[in-house]
């Protein structure tokens, strides 16, 4: 039976690909197409047996890996038993969200496109490659790509119904109704202490929340420790996922902006109006207050889709026109100047556009949901203690706006008291080094990039592997030398060689790549003579490429080869899984 829907399937790690998928869903729905949007792993694989049109939008994570919510789908496509005619009835398009500062730029979308072709699927529109380094970001490239997609799609598929007007309000994707059978204010619904925050699968209790950067340092870095069940397991390189929630003051301000005070504690029943559309996670007690507190991301930067939605619910002509301008790609620079560059939040936007009052029925269409935040686990798994540790640099900075900018998870961690219990998740990382082998391991981890390296060092020491080198970098020895006592202990025991670069402790700035160059002969011998491994962890700015430049230079200097051959040496390490880079 022919499938009349267009499927928009995404693989998203940080929410970018998912946001683009939602935007395309609204655009195609407005054009009159029947559209379904889901993560690839939530897609019903039986649909692949029918003729269908699919648009795939995916990001790349790790070293060219697939995002978590498309791995099941990807594993299915990789089955060797699938014939090369399996997807003969599929017409598809692929858009990748990437960053050219990474070596394997848009690797996931390229691999997906190639595999779909191998299985017989036909591309009806050229593959798009979004780039965070583009002047207009991924969204700018996506908007251009979509215009081409629309014309190509029109050639193969006729809309199912008349198109909506440019400024017509689309029907809500979710049905949100007040459960009148329980009354508007049921006893207990206003008591938020009994809410079970069970979004993750693993019960955790915070036992330690301590600042480990100097109180005088500009950045607050926290060492968090959680007590979790002893049977839980993780490996070096794995990540913990924290699910923050909004503070009560912000929640009440948001509810006041929306005019929802009269239904603040009203119990809700929520279902999907769109076939195969998965509902987000909800707390066990679902009322308006808890929907805003635990589900809606009111401190995120508003998307263009938000402005388009908000324009429908303003009775102020000037506000409506301005909101519509922000929603249009034609005014993308104005949108960036108002939102992205100053990092203005959804709540702050609503406080400025006071005429906007979005009805509760459109809450899940207008506002993004809170996403889990991933942090590298900073200690080895010891089931005798059941303790999981993280090192988290809290995000707080100033823009042109009066109030400091603060990430939702950073805001949450600041107010998180010890003995608070909630659920978390542990996800597998992508570390493909043979770290349990008796080979030297050279590690580079400036700042909180040292967190996964701490777990790795502890694991190797536990297994009796002593040839560990750590190049650590920070601003000042007295300000942000993270886990200093641990490194002192390991060096005294002879299980670690430590090289530090304190960039601001001398007149000329010194970074990790300079420390690597100063110890070039040692690094070269470990890599070339002893088949050593190399692990870079930390910021995705200039550091990773500077480290790679340093290694290439060292190889050239001590082997007598050209600098080009030095880079080829690094590439060969990557291919042999001896050079790993985990940056964010």
UniProtKB/Swiss-Prot annotation:
Q: What's the protein called, per UniProt?
A: NADPH-dependent diflavin oxidoreductase 1
Q: Which cofactor does it need?
A: FAD; FMN
Q: One GO term of the cellular component aspect? A: mitochondrion
Q: Which family does it belong to?
A: Belongs to the NADPH-dependent diflavin oxidoreductase NDOR1 family.
Major localization listed first in the record, in broad terms: cytoplasm
> Alphabetically, which GO biological process terms does the record hold?
[4Fe-4S] cluster assembly
> Pfam families, per this entry?
FAD_binding_1 (PF00667), Flavodoxin_1 (PF00258), NAD_binding_1 (PF00175)
What molecular function terms (GO) are annotated for this protein?
A: flavin adenine dinucleotide binding; FMN binding; NADP binding; NADPH-hemoprotein reductase activity; oxidoreductase activity
Location(s), subcellular: Cytoplasm; Mitochondrion
Write the record's keywords in alphabetical order, separated by commas: Cytoplasm, FAD, Flavoprotein, FMN, Mitochondrion, NADP, Oxidoreductase
Residues in FAD-binding FR-type domain copies:
199-436
Gene name linked to the record: tah18
């Amino acid at each position: 039976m022919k499938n009349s829907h267009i499927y928009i399937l995404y693989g998203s790690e940080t929410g970018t690909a998912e946001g683009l998928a939602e935007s395309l869903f609204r655009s195609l729905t407005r054009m009159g197409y029947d559209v379904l949007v889901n993560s690839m792993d939530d897609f019903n694989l039986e649909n692949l047996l029918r003729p269908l049109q699919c648009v795939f939008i995916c990001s790349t994570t790790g070293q060219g890996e697939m995002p978590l919510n498309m791995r099941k789908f990807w594993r299915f496509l990789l089955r060797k038993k699938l014939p090369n005619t399996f997807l003969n009835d599929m017409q598809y398009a692929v858009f990748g969200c990437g960053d050219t500062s990474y070596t394997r730029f848009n690797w996931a979308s390229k691999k997906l496109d190639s595999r779909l072709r191998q299985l017989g699927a036909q591309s009806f529109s050229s593959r798009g490659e979004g780039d965070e380094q583009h002047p207009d970001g991924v969204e700018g490239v996506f908007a251009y790509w979509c215009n081409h997609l629309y014309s190509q799609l029109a050639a193969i598929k006729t809309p199912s119904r008349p198109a909506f007007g440019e400024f017509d309000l689309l029907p809500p994707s979710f049905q949100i109704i007040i459960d009148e059978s329980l009354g508007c204010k049921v006893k207990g619904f206003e008591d938020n202490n009994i809410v079970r925050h069970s979004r993750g699968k693993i019960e955790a209790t915070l036992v330690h929340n301590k600042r480990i950067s100097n109180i005088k340092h500009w950045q607050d870095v926290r060492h968090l420790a959680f007590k979790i069940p002893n049977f839980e397991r993780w490996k070096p390189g794995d990540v913990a996922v924290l699910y923050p929630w909004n503070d009560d003051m912000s929640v009440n301000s948001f509810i006041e902006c929306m005019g929802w005070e009269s239904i603040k504690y009203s119990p809700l029943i929520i279902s999907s109006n769109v076939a195969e559309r998965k509902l987000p996670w909800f707390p066990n007690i679902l009322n308006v207050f808890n929907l805003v507190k635990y589900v809606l991301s009111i401190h995120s930067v508003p998307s263009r889709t938000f402005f388009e939605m908000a324009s429908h619910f303003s009775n102020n002509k000037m506000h409506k026109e301005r909101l519509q301008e922000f929603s249009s790609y034609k005014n993308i620079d104005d949108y960036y100047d108002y939102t992205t560059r100053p990092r203005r939040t959804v709540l702050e936007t609503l406080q400025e556009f006071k005429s906007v009052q979005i009805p509760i029925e459109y809450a899940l269409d207008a506002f993004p949901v809170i996403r889990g935040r991933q942090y590298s686990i900073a200690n080895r798994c010891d089931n005798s203690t059941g303790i999981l540790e993280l090192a988290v640099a809290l995000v707080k900075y100033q823009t042109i706006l009066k109030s400091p900018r603060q990430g939702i998870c950073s805001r949450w961690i600041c107010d998180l008291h010890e003995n608070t219990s909630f659920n978390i998740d542990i996800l597998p990382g992508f570390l493909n080094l043979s770290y349990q082998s008796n080979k030297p391991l050279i590690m580079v981890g400036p700042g909180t990039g040292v967190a996964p390296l701490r777990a790795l060092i502890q694991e190797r020491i536990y297994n009796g592997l002593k040839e560990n080198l750590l190049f650590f970098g920070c601003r000042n020895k007295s300000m942000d030398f993270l886990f200093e006592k641990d490194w002192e202990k390991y060096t005294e025991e002879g299980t670690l060689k430590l090289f530090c670069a304190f960039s601001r402790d001398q007149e000329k700035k010194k970074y990790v790549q300079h420390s690597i160059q100063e110890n070039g002969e040692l690094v070269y011998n470990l890599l070339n003579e002893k088949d050593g491994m190399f692990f870079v962890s930390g910021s995705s700015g200039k550091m990773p490429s500077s480290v790679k430049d340093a290694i290439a230079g060292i190889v050239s200097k001590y082997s007598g080869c050209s600098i080009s051959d030095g880079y080829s040496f690094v590439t060969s390490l990557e291919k042999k899984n001896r050079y790993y880079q985990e940056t964010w």
